[in-house]
From Swiss-Prot:
Pfam families: Carboxyl_trans (PF01039). It comes from Gossypium barbadense. Component of the acetyl coenzyme A carboxylase (ACC) complex. Biotin carboxylase (BC) catalyzes the carboxylation of biotin on its carrier protein (BCCP) and then the CO(2) group is transferred by the transcarboxylase to acetyl-CoA to form malonyl-CoA. Coiled coil: none annotated. PANTHER family: ACETYL-COENZYME A CARBOXYLASE CARBOXYL TRANSFERASE SUBUNIT BETA, CHLOROPLASTIC. This is Acetyl-coenzyme A carboxylase carboxyl transferase subunit beta, chloroplastic. GO terms for molecular function: acetyl-CoA carboxylase activity; ATP binding; carboxyl- or carbamoyltransferase activity; zinc ion binding. One of its GO terms (cellular component) is chloroplast stroma.
């Protein structure tokens, strides 16, 4: 049986299809005559760029794809398509990529059911003619170079129809010059001279007149890509990083070294010795204390959404652990939970953590990533600034204990104005956005333009706003040395009771 497979590659705005072909058995399908001319000018251009395999006794060319494919993932997985050839004969195609099977079926009842189901997708003029072939079922296999070219024409046409249904073609492309030599499928599968060599790959690039085509943006596609790829936030990069490899690299862009946002769980894993994390107050929640009114959605519903999305109950995780064997108390804010905004539960969890560290004489580390106080709780969220600052005063001034504040991007608003800037040592990450009020708020309030980079960590470091700028890679070692410098040492087997 002839084997075929497809891979889709999305790279730098271009869609490339790669088709690999290999032969193993002799089989061929009866010819389907190509007697009519496609009225679609775009399709005509496509046919011009595909080798004419006139000597082939078995081929499909100009096959229309009648069933719209909703998702590009369906094309490279097992699926059934409804097509018609230039003689208006209709067939269903079953494409099994795993077992490398390509089957044709012209069963009338099945086609009628498909036509009825997909009627809304296509013009009824496509559905006027029945199948003229008496054979109910075919296996389409490669035989020789001529048949190969017929197969290639058929696959080319299927891909053409699929791309036309999935890709938005710019009006300037559609109205391009008739003298254009490049169709949006500029390379054909048959290769030079129409000969397909065994084991060779061929590229199909979606481009016309040098202009790239763009994929339709659907919420499902965007959600899928967000789960696989992360775009760099640096204005000079915007590179795309594979999510799985990015996690192993501490969420640092592989292309420019920019420090991307991290989930609180990843930061805890980065900072704490494995197996030593002990969370605190995980079940602490609050309701809607001021019954905040919103035209968009209820405050409670919004909290429920972020709880499901992040798996957290609030915008911070607090607990205890060991830093290279040194017991510490640590709190890590999570920007993915409503922008890391501070509300009553966040303030209460931080306050309880500080009090626990005070009573147990533990060094304290707070990792800040927040947009400020949460407006949905009004003054109740603002009062957390004073409550946390009061607890820190007792911890630092009365007990003389050691507190390290780590400012990540972004750290703004009430967090900056309270515990974010109260550390004995204040550490910032590279390129972190640190401010009290955001750039847009300042410009709208003062009616003045804020210079670019004036709220970046590197600029503020030279103004003396904090102590060191420490990348993520050596951060754990730096924290360990600072804690030991202030009189906290690792536990040993003799001190454990």
């Amino acid at each position: 049986m002839e084997k075929s497979w497809f891979n889709l590659i999305l790279s730098k705005g271009e869609l490339e299809y790669r088709c690999g072909l290999s032969k193993s058995m002799d089989s061929r399908l009866g010819p389907v005559e190509n007697t009519t001319v496609n009225e679609d000018p775009t399709r005509n251009d496509t046919d011009k760029n595909i080798h004419d395999c006139s000597d082939s006794s078995s081929y499909y060319s100009k096959v229309d794809h009648l069933v719209d494919v909703k998702d590009i993932r369906n094309f490279i997985s097992d699926d059934t398509f409804l097509i018609r050839d230039s003689n208006q004969d209709r067939y269903s195609i079953y494409f099994d990529s795993e077992n490398q099977i390509f089957e044709l079926n012209n069963d009338h009842s099945f086609l009628s059911e498909l036509e009825s189901f997909f009627y809304s997708y296509h013009n009824s003029s496509y559905m006027n003619n029945g199948s003229k072939n008496d054979e109910p079922h075919y296996h389409f296999n490669l035989y020789d170079n001529d048949t190969n070219c017929g197969w290639n024409n058929h696959i080319n046409s299927c891909i053409d129809s699929y791309l036309r249904s999935q890709i938005c073609i710019d009006s300037s492309i559609l109205s391009g010059s008739d003298n254009s030599n490049d169709n949006y499928i500029s390379n054909y599968i048959c290769g030079e001279g129409g000969n397909s060599s065994e084991g060779k790959n061929f590229d199909i690039i979606t481009r016309e007149n040098g202009n790239d085509l763009t994929l339709k943006e659907s919420s499902n596609d965007l959600d899928l890509y967000k789960d696989l790829w992360v775009q760099c936030e640096c204005e000079n990069c915007y590179g795309v990083n594979y999510k799985k490899s990015l996690n192993s690299k501490m969420n640092i862009c592989e292309q420019c070294g920019y420090h991307l946002k991290m989930r609180s769980s990843d930061r805890i894993e980065l900072s704490i010795d494995p197996g030593t994390w002990g969370p605190m107050d995980e079940d602490m929640i609050s309701l809607d204390p001021i019954e905040f009114q919103s035209e968009e959605e209820l405050y409670k519903d919004r909290i429920d959404f972020y709880q499901r999305k992040t798996g957290l109950t609030e915008a911070i995780q607090t607990g205890t652990g060991q830093l290279n064997g040194i017991p510490i108390a640590i709190g890590v804010m999570d920007f993915q939970f409503m922008g890391g905004s501070m509300r009553s539960v966040v303030g209460e969890k931080i306050t309880r953590l500080i009090e626990y560290a005070t009573n147990n004489f533990l060094p304290l580390i707070l990792v800040c990533a927040s947009g400020g106080a949460r407006m949905q709780e009004g003054s109740l969220s603002l009062m957390q600034m004073a409550k946390i600052s009061s607890a820190l005063y007792d911890y630092q001034s009365n007990k003389k204990l050691f507190y390290v504040s780590i400012l990540t991007s972004p750290t703004t608003g009430g967090v900056t104005a309270s515990f974010g800037m109260l550390g004995d040592i204040i550490i910032a990450e590279p390129n972190a956005y640190i401010a009290f009020a955001g750039k847009r708020v300042i410009e709208q309030t003062l009616n003045k333009t804020i210079p670019e980079g004036s709220q970046a960590a590197e600029y503020l470091f030279h103004k003396g706003l904090f102590d060191p700028i420490v990348p993520r890679n050596p951060l754990k070692g730096v924290l360990s040395e600072l804690v030991q410098l202030h009189g906290f040492f690792p536990l040993n087997q003799y001190s454990i009771k």
